[in-house]
Amino acid sequence: METHMAKPKAPAGIENPVQLAVIGAAHGIKGEVRVKTFTEDPMALGSYGPLHMVDGRVLQVAAIRPAKEVVIVRFKGVDGRNAAEALNGEALFVDRSALPEKLEEEEFYYADLIGMAVLDEKGENLGRVVAVHNFGAGDLLEFRENSGPTVIIPFTRDAVPDIDLSNNTIRIDSITAGLDNAELSGEEDEAEGPESARGSRPRGPKSAGEPR
């Protein structure tokens, strides 16, 4: 499973940057790259318009196709494997104005959650969110512990009772989330929590790829 820590330094010239993706390894010899997106619909990445990098460069999607856990993207002007390899690790941003303006209550952009600090009931920092997944049974948050391993918990109201965007923090209920001392000490890498914690909790706009 690929994981990517965020949020890196944002690009200059964007008033309210939102990270949509991070570029991975080159794919083939024609300039394509593997891209991990933080959008609900990975195939919609090209619908947001120009994608900004931290160093000020701007990329536009020329072609996109699905792959396991990522999408394969060819950007305009990126020709050949060497050019593609030079993009490895680059984060891609858009201004928030490019996203649909209104969210429902208890709805969040996946991109907003990446990099948020995960706190337990006592306020202890457990790590930071590195990914949001959905394998068909509901949204899951993956966070990387301060000591190293990653943990997966259900993204439900019971397991994640508080999300504070202004302070960039998420508070979890350790028991409902299915965490125990063994998992937090690194003996287990993943925990999906009890089935009773998989209540409905809307996330991310359904039309995440539609430009304004």
UniProtKB/Swiss-Prot annotation:
InterPro entries: PRC_barrel-like_sf, PRC_RimM, RimM, RimM_N, RimM_N_sf, Transl_B-barrel_sf. One of its GO terms (cellular component) is ribosome. GO terms for molecular function: ribosome binding. Pfam families: PRC_RimM (PF24986), RimM (PF01782). One of its GO terms (biological process) is ribosomal small subunit biogenesis. Residues 105-181 form the PRC barrel domain. It is found in: Cytoplasm. The keyword ATP-binding does not apply. Keywords: Chaperone, Cytoplasm, Ribosome biogenesis, rRNA processing. Residues 181-212 are annotated as: Disordered. The keyword DNA repair does not apply. The PRC barrel domain binds ribosomal protein uS19. An accessory protein needed during the final step in the assembly of 30S ribosomal subunit, possibly for assembly of the head region. Essential for efficient processing of 16S rRNA. May be needed both before and after RbfA during the maturation of 16S rRNA. It has affinity for free ribosomal 30S subunits but not for 70S ribosomes. Binds ribosomal protein uS19. Belongs to the RimM family. PANTHER family: RIBOSOME MATURATION FACTOR RIMM (PTHR33692:SF1). This is Ribosome maturation factor RimM. The lineage of its organism: Bacteria, Pseudomonadati, Pseudomonadota, Alphaproteobacteria, Hyphomicrobiales.
